[in-house]
Amino acid sequence: MKYENKTVYLEANENYYKGAPKIKYLQWRETSDADKIAGVEQGTIDLSDPSGSKSAFDQIKSINSNGELDGDKIMVNATDNLGYGYIGINADTVKVGDDGSSDASKDLRKAIATVFAVYRDVAIDSYYGDAASVINYPISNTSWAAPQKSDADYKAAYSVDVDGNALYTDDMSDDEKFAAATQAALGFFEAAGYTVEDGKVTAAPEGAKMSYEIIIGADGNGDHPSFAILTDAKAALESIGFTLEINDVTDSNIMWDALNAGTAEMWAAAWQATIDPDMYQTYHSESVKSNYYHINDATLDQDIIDARSSADQEYRKSVYKQCLDIILDWAVEIPVYQRQNCIIYSPERINADTFTKDVSTFYYWYKDIENIEMN
């Protein structure tokens, strides 16, 4: 019908092929995330999609009289997001010498990645609670190609030392794990050619540095799922003489401009995935515009082509597992979290019995929008 004041006004098509929608008029309004839950509570919004964070779920529970996510004021539909959060490392700017594919360059990145990885559990639980889980491979858990914990060769990301020995045991405390990761980082730094003396990194090899920057779009105030990972990692690395500079930008375009220019060293972001897990756009060496990692591996390139050329899902899954292992060996990506998408609505104004059933990652609430009724 029209658009004005950041609102789209829509009128139902009575000749819609699935039947005339029960609701004749809709307004889609641009709203800040901070106002979405309160808007549904106060009646200015009927349905919305706030970020599914721990604080958001706690807010919803406090609004409902039963203290649950589904209650008299707000109903919640939460599904796994088709995508995942990660920390990236540029192999062209974080390397030893002039070869980002060398073992020394990989060891440098593994030193940093190992420290990042050990702080994921605490940070993600603090930010998301039950609304997200830590992942160990650079692929969304919603994908049929994602490795499962029940797989024989499944392992936590960056959980071994420079000699391939497991860093952690089930009975270790968090502090013991943090200490083990920091000690392992020293081993990787030394293997990369850094000078290590008395438990500290004292000098970098040619082409490498003692300080690197990571960019994160956390609104300048640390509001990001991975921000706590960075601050904890910064302190741990500084304790062994290595500096991690955190650049928390208020404008995320600064980060994306650096990625597009190939100048970023490290960054924290999230990928939006597709139903098919084709990896060409993100990891193939000829995908120059979106291979922000600058990973250039002939075996990986061929595996990506082989997997996308087959219709055999089991074969593709096994080849994609090989791809994931290569990406982790290059240490250009630290998988961080699989979060949930959240749709909330007011049962006081929307008839809950008519709301879309069996909402999932791949079946959105608006697939049956024509059946939804207002009270």
Where are the regions a protein language model picked out?
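Short, solvent-exposed loop/beta-turn-alpha elements that line the ligand-binding surface or hinge
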Residues: 1, 21, 62-79, 88-103, ...
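Extracellular/periplasmic solute-recognition and catalytic clefts
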Residues: 2-9, 27-95, 119, 125-131
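Soluble non-cytosolic domains of exported or imported proteins
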Residues: 4, 31-35, 102-107, 175-183, ...
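Append "and occasionally in soluble cytosolic enzymes with long acidic Gly/Pro-rich linkers
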Residues: 9, 103-235, 368-375
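Solvent-exposed, polar/charged alpha-helical surfaces in well-ordered, non-transmembrane soluble domains
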Residues: 11, 15, 24, 34-38, ...
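A local structural motif
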Residues: 18-29, 208-212, 235-249
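Periplasmic binding protein-like
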Residues: 40, 45-47, 235-290
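Bilobed periplasmic-binding protein-like "clamshell/Venus-flytrap" ligand-binding domains
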Residues: 123-125, 192-219, 270, 311-347
